[in-house]
Design a protein with these regions (language model features):
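Phosphate-binding site recognition
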Residues: 1-424, 439-440
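Active-site metal-binding core of divalent-cation-utilizing nuclease and nuclease-like domains
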Residues: 136-141, 435-463
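Structural motif
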Residues: 146, 464-466, 500
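Mg2+/Mn2+-dependent nuclease catalytic core
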Residues: 166-171, 472-489
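Metal-dependent nuclease catalytic cores in nucleic-acid-processing enzymes
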Residues: 176-183, 336-344, 433-437, 482-502
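Conserved catalytic cores of phosphodiester-cleaving nucleases, focusing on short active-site segments
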Residues: 432, 455-472, 486
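Domain-level recognition of nuclease-like catalytic cores that cleave nucleotide substrates
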Residues: 491, 495-521
Length: 521
């Protein structure tokens, strides 16, 4: 059975080690970063990816708490274990704040550190208080100071696209961070984490020598759980889950990969699992939607609508690094937000064109995202019922009963209120795309090119390939005639599976499927 309990909700390295909970060993990365030529480092990763635990690990390492690192990789790497003064600031508590509230919050976290260092009459301004802290810690210990700032961008994320509020909060944060530059001689190591890198904040505009490790291949596995770590450090956990699910070990690993794997943070990167979902899956013994359920993507859905991004345009997509590893407050496309928030990830890199292929990482994200997009096309009650319909459709399609699946879909569409009916063909195509995407276990592609045109949708199941052509206010026969006239099926004859053509015609007056035709190619 699994030896250690899972550190769910615990982000403190010291507590995890003292309570002997599961810790995935990241200390080789800690040693590597602490012994490079750099002094300033920044790491961005999506929420709940282990950034706070990483910061806590750095804190205990630089405080020289060697006993906490017994049995870990760094025990054999580090020879000196020098104790440094550490200033640790967690800005995650600074969310959803106005200017005055943020200033008071910064004062609060500064006061906690000032008490540790015996500062009873601090300066007034936040930047001067941080400067005084650095100098006091340096003078009292005779050693350079380590500064750790977790979630540096938390106060600004909520107002990233509200220019007036953003400017006000950004000025406060710029002022707070400014001592990190002119106190350089007193500093041993500075590490900041966040989700995005805001432009015009002093740590990026003034610290020209800051090392950005977010897309560095040497640190691609510093957060999250790599496939190698899963297979070497969590063997008992896999066996316990397999026993609980009555599955083979190999089948469990494959399902874990399907649901929670797929992240890559560099051109060359190990496969990285979402740590929050993976640990919750092992703890609950269920393949649930944990990461997605822990945060509603309301803001993302709003921005998708603002940028007029259609569901089938989200991913896959190609982009230069500068197009997605970029400040989100000035983004011209949705790509930086999708990437930095963890909804898409790197899947490939072309050296010749320097283009990255970005795609949705795994089943949990794909299902969660498209499930949240469905209410854009149907009302809330209909969207909830849609989940039931989609599950039943998937079962029928697995049994090669496409006719039964479309009958279910027709019945479902007829429950959607009239206010969601439109005479725009693209609306029905996108709605159908979302629904077919939610038919988990299948592969879906849209507007697939053939020598003589484009197929609206191609659905690949374990047993069949379906070519789907849509029409609005015409006839299913017209859709089938187009597929036959242009010989769409010949483009797929080498797929090795039976090909079925499906013509679907929508009626804009009812908002439902009027008729359909199914033929074997």
């Amino acid at each position: 059975m699994a030896i250690k309990l899972y550190p769910l909700g615990i982000q403190t390295f010291e507590r995890i080690r003292e309570e002997d909970k599961l810790y995935i060993d990241k200390t080789e990365y800690i040693y590597r970063m602490a012994h490079t030529n750099g002094k300033y480092f920044f790491l961005s990763r999506p929420r709940r990816f282990g950034k706070s635990l990483l910061v806590s690990t750095f804190k205990n390492y630089f405080e020289g708490k060697r006993n906490l690192f017994k049995g870990l990789a760094i025990e054999n790497l580090e020879k000196e274990w020098t104790e440094y003064p550490v200033l640790h600031f967690d800005l995650s508590g600074g969310k959803h704040m106005e200017k005055d509230q943020l200033e008071r919050y910064l004062g609060f976290i500064l006061e906690m550190e000032e008490k540790k260092w015996g500062i009873t009459q601090p300066q007034v301004d936040a930047n001067n208080r941080l400067t005084e802290l650095i100098y006091t810690a340096y003078e009292k210990t005779g050693k350079q100071v380590v500064v750790l700032i977790d979630e540096y961008d938390a106060p600004m994320l909520d107002v990233a696209h509200e220019q007036e509020q953003l400017d006000a909060l950004r000025n406060i944060m710029r002022n707070f961070f400014s001592p990190l530059k002119f106190c350089e001689a007193k500093l041993r190591f500075v590490f900041l984490t966040g989700i995005t890198k805001f432009s015009q904040v002093s740590i990026f505009s003034e610290l020209n020598n800051i090392t950005l490790i977010s897309m560095d291949k040497d640190y691609a596995g510093i957060c999250g759980i790599t496939q190698e770590e899963l297979l070497t450090q969590m063997q008992e956990d896999i066996d316990m889950l397999a026993q609980s699910q009555d599955m083979t070990r190999e089948a469990v690993i494959a399902k874990l990969k399907e649901h929670y794997d797929g992240y890559h943070f560099a051109k060359v990167s190990p496969d990285v699992f979402n740590p929050y979902s993976l640990l919750n899956c092992f703890a609950e013994k269920e393949f649930g939607s944990y990461w997605f359920s822990s945060g509603t993507p309301t803001y993302l859905i709003h921005m998708l609508n603002k940028f007029e991004v259609l569901p089938n345009e989200i991913a896959p997509t190609e982009a230069l690094e500068s197009a997605f590893d970029a400040p989100t407050e000035k983004m011209k496309t949705i790509t930086p937000l999708l990437y930095q928030s963890g909804y898409v990830t790197i899947k490939d890199y072309n050296k010749d064109t320097q283009l990255y292929t970005l795609d949705i990482p795994n089943k949990e994200i794909r299902v969660g995202l498209f499930d949240n997009l469905l209410p854009n096309y149907v009302d809330g009650k209909s969207a909830q019922q849609g989940g039931v319909t989609i599950a039943k459709m998937a079962s029928l399609i697995r049994k090669q009963d496409m006719d039964g699946a479309l009958q279910l879909l027709q019945d479902y569409f007829e429950t959607i209120p009239y206010c969601h009916v439109t005479n725009h063909e693209g609306h029905y195509q996108q709605m159908l795309y979302i629904i077919f995407t939610l038919l988990t276990g299948f592969v879906l592609d849209v507007e697939v090119h053939t020598p003589r045109g484009r197929v609206d949708m191609v659905l690949l199941t374990q047993t069949d390939l379906y070519l789907i052509e849509l029409k609005l206010n015409k006839s299913a026969q017209a859709a089938m005639r187009q597929m036959n006239l242009k010989n769409y099926h010949k483009r797929f004859v080498l797929c090795g599976k039976p090909i079925t053509k499906v013509g679907i015609n929508f009626d804009s007056t009812t908002g439902s499927i009027h008729d359909w035709i199914i033929e074997k190619a």
